[in-house]
């Protein structure tokens, strides 16, 4: 179990963990179970930064969390925007997403996300980052449960066929937050609705999900929960 958690941590982060296993193809299907636990780590870093009154420390923790955990999700978010918003065929959209070139949709909405996130980082309840980071990772598990892979290869396809028990285990791992009942229910509801809608959009646009869509969903749900918790 510990080795699977460490593999999960290394898989959805940039942490230089060298985990050697002989049965990776079997283990990789189990990694989504531990995604919410990774979220607790990310949330802790953002929490410490948001809690600090020192601007230099705030920036340090923000860079730390974003570089090691959220930067490649941000890349997926940008690629997904450019692909989904392109008025073309499924094949062309997948090609745009795989190239990774930054288009106008990615520039606009990516900048908007950064501006909103920075303002929330300065003003929102620091604990909300703990919640949003956990549910952001949980949303990737839900998206796998709701969807099918758009391609037969790539990072997203590694998790399919999806093992349903991953959804049960990952849901249980979110229960640590249930003591904050109101925020938990709001976050769970937002995650369920948003992830379901994204799965339908992804199926319509590209025939399923990719690694970019999974990462982009994580970041989008993370930011959306932060915003909603701060507003309500």
Curated annotation (Swiss-Prot):
<feature type="transmembrane region" description="Helical">
    <location>
        <begin position="126"/>
        <end position="146"/>
    </location>
</feature>
<comment type="function">
    <text>Joins adenosylcobinamide-GDP and alpha-ribazole to generate adenosylcobalamin (Ado-cobalamin). Also synthesizes adenosylcobalamin 5'-phosphate from adenosylcobinamide-GDP and alpha-ribazole 5'-phosphate.</text>
</comment>
<dbReference type="Pfam" id="PF02654">
    <property type="entry name" value="CobS"/>
</dbReference>
<feature type="transmembrane region" description="Helical">
    <location>
        <begin position="59"/>
        <end position="79"/>
    </location>
</feature>
<feature type="transmembrane region" description="Helical">
    <location>
        <begin position="31"/>
        <end position="51"/>
    </location>
</feature>
<dbReference type="GO" id="GO:0008818">
    <property type="term" value="F:cobalamin 5'-phosphate synthase activity"/>
</dbReference>
<feature type="transmembrane region" description="Helical">
    <location>
        <begin position="167"/>
        <end position="187"/>
    </location>
</feature>
<comment type="pathway">
    <text>Cofactor biosynthesis; adenosylcobalamin biosynthesis; adenosylcobalamin from cob(II)yrinate a,c-diamide: step 7/7.</text>
</comment>
<keyword id="KW-0997">Cell inner membrane</keyword>
<keyword id="KW-0169">Cobalamin biosynthesis</keyword>
<keyword id="KW-0808">Transferase</keyword>
<feature type="transmembrane region" description="Helical">
    <location>
        <begin position="209"/>
        <end position="229"/>
    </location>
</feature>
<keyword id="KW-0472">Membrane</keyword>
<dbReference type="GO" id="GO:0009236">
    <property type="term" value="P:cobalamin biosynthetic process"/>
</dbReference>
<keyword id="KW-0812">Transmembrane</keyword>
<dbReference type="GO" id="GO:0005886">
    <property type="term" value="C:plasma membrane"/>
</dbReference>
<keyword id="KW-1003">Cell membrane</keyword>
<dbReference type="GO" id="GO:0051073">
    <property type="term" value="F:adenosylcobinamide-GDP ribazoletransferase activity"/>
</dbReference>
<keyword id="KW-1133">Transmembrane helix</keyword>
<comment type="similarity">
    <text>Belongs to the CobS family.</text>
</comment>
<dbReference type="InterPro" id="IPR003805">
    <property type="entry name" value="CobS"/>
</dbReference>
<feature type="transmembrane region" description="Helical">
    <location>
        <begin position="102"/>
        <end position="122"/>
    </location>
</feature>
<protein>
    <recommendedName>
        <fullName>Adenosylcobinamide-GDP ribazoletransferase</fullName>
        <ecNumber>2.7.8.26</ecNumber>
    </recommendedName>
</protein>
<keyword id="KW-0460">Magnesium</keyword>
């Amino acid at each position: 179990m510990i080795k699977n958690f460490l593999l999960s941590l290394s898989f959805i982060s940039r942490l230089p963990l060298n985990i050697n296993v002989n049965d990776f193809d079997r283990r990789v299907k189990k990694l989504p179970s531990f995604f919410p636990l990774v979220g607790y780590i990310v949330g802790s870093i953002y929490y410490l930064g948001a809690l600090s009154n020192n601007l230099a420390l705030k920036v340090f923790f923000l860079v730390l969390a974003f570089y090691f955990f959220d930067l490649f999700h941000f890349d997926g978010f940008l690629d997904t925007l450019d692909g989904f918003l392109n008025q073309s065929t499924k094949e062309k959209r997948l090609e745009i997403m795989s190239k990774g070139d930054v288009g106008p949709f990615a520039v606009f909405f990516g900048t908007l996300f950064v501006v909103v996130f920075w303002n929330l980082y300065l003003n929102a309840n620091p604990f909300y980052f703990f919640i949003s980071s956990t549910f952001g990772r949980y949303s990737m598990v839900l998206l796998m449960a709701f969807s099918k892979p758009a391609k037969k290869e790539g990072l997203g396809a590694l998790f399919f066929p999806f093992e349903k028990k991953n959804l049960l285990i990952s849901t249980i791992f979110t229960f640590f937050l249930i003591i904050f009942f109101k925020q938990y229910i709001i976050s769970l509801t937002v995650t369920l609705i948003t992830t379901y809608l994204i799965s339908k959009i992804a199926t319509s646009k590209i025939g399923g999900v990719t690694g970019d869509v999974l990462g982009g969903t994580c970041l989008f749900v993370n930011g959306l929960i932060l915003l909603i918790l701060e507003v309500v």
